[in-house]
Amino acid sequence: MALVLAVGTATPSARADAAPRKETSYYSTRSVLAEFFPGSEHVGFRTFAIDQSIRARLAQRLGYAPARDKYTIFIATTHGKVDGYAVVDDEQGLHQPITFATRLSPRGMVERVEIMVYREPRGDEVRDVRFRKQFQGKTSQDPLRLNRDIDAVSGATVSSASLAVGVRRATILVEELALGLSTLASAPAAAPAGERDAMAARPRAARPASVNR
């Protein structure tokens, strides 16, 4: 697999009211993509600017306006055929952002979810394979409601809710921005400018009222 990622590192800034941080890194962007697509010939990316029209469309589907002005979607190909997509993103936990990666099929179905960086002092039980496997087979049509579509991990309710919100966003981003775009296949296999392995903390996204922090 040809994979060349130009990435930097950064330490996310904590909120003033945050609890003591216990940051543990499990994957870099490079390593998670290599594990997601071990047999792919090429892994590239495309960064999508979120203009007013796209933001409104995403907000309608998500139930909240996305916080970022652009999103990067990675794509794996072999002989020009799409093997799958990946989204590396952050979702706010109780005090700190959780960095995670979602692998999706060529049709936008969730195949795997991995925690890349966990920064909370507790709640990392969301790394348990039994919790993460609940997302397999889900698509943008699944609401991923906590304790209805996805069972929360005992003692990690907020982190469970955060991952459900983040994975659902990944399915919608891929469907709205990437599916069917042949130009993705020719994107260079290099990390987008400003992408960071440790994924600096990002502005807190508006969240659906039904999600309990």
Describe these PLM feature segments:
Residues 1-8:
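Bacterial N-terminal signal peptides
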Residues 9-13:
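Predominantly cytoplasmic-facing regulatory/coupling regions of multi-pass membrane proteins
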Residues 14-161, 165-213:
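Flexible, solvent-exposed loop/hinge segments and secondary-structure transition points
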